[in-house]
Amino acid sequence: MTKIAIIEDDAVISQMYRMKFEAEGYEVQMAANGRLGVELVGKMRPDIILLDLRMPEMDGAEALTQIRKKDWGKNIPVLILTNVGVEEAPKELENLNVLSYIVKADLTPRQVTEKVKEALAK
């Protein structure tokens, strides 16, 4: 079963995506901040990560930096799913092999699901 890690501090949003992906047959696990997200990815070894940028304790850019430092985290596809516009995105993301950058307000949950399917098909 394909595994998705959702690292998002907004419980309503993460739960909405969890239900959407589980209905599509994916295994989904969630973390509410970057620190917990790094731990989750280390244990879970997901096939893809949906990552918010602005979170408490550790933001998404720092979490992804930590994930990419690990052998197991170097090649996991990552979709940034955030309210931060691309022009405001942290510069360090440019060097962290982000597959796609999605502004939450720009896409419906169905469209995000399609983006994940496309990414997994590559």
List PLM regions with ranges.
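Helix N-cap/capping motif at the beta->alpha junctions
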Residues: 30-39, 60
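Charged docking surfaces used in two-component/phosphorelay signaling
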Residues: 15-23
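Active-site residues of response regulator receiver
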Residues: 52, 82
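Active-site beta3 strand of CheY-like receiver
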Residues: 44-50
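Short amphipathic alpha-helix used as the core "switch/output" element in two-component signaling
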Residues: 39, 61-74
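Receiver (REC) domain active-site loop signature in two-component systems and cognate sites
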Residues: 55
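Conserved acidic carboxylate
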Residues: 8
